């Protein structure tokens, strides 16, 4: 099955990501929180991608297919079939921002909207952390301050925000944030009382907007794209 990638300047940077970064991002798209392949995944049924299973650069050589998978999840399935591809990343980002009630001005750059999203994610996650998790996070970003309001300016200035959010998304203690619970942490209130170290308080059965966007996939995916963009940018400076 083909994955049609729509040329997207906001996703072109993915070609500069490492194999590990792309493999982790692809898995976020293609597998659910139980480690099972999503039935709606197109990438996992793509013959070219499957033929490179075990190749050391399977994901790097197919970054456009991975980007196309994100575009696929960002668009309505029926609309995707009609136009032959999914949505551009910026449209997905604006959809996510609207869903999470973030004030994203269309005049803002993609980078600025992402920055706003990352900051809100970090603020809401911090509120749900116990002291042990806070200290683990501070250690992960090499921070010497203990309060979030002191930490945020440093993260912005030193380009460590992406490192911090990536730690939260990938760490075992917050694995629920990689899936549907990301919406709760961002403040949308779809889940109640789901602490970072505790069990998920409720399960989402494929939350979708009128447009058909699968937010249980696109919200954590957009967060990860924002992180990867900053990591790649930092290596190119």
From Swiss-Prot:
This is UPF0174 protein YaaW. It comes from the Bacteria. Pfam families: DUF3944, Ubiq_cyt_C_chap. Transmembrane segments: none annotated. Belongs to the UPF0174 family. Disruption phenotype: Strand-specific deletion mutant, which disrupts only yaaW, shows no difference in growth compared with wild-type strain at 37 degrees Celsius or after heat shock. Biofilm formation is increased at 37 degrees Celsius.
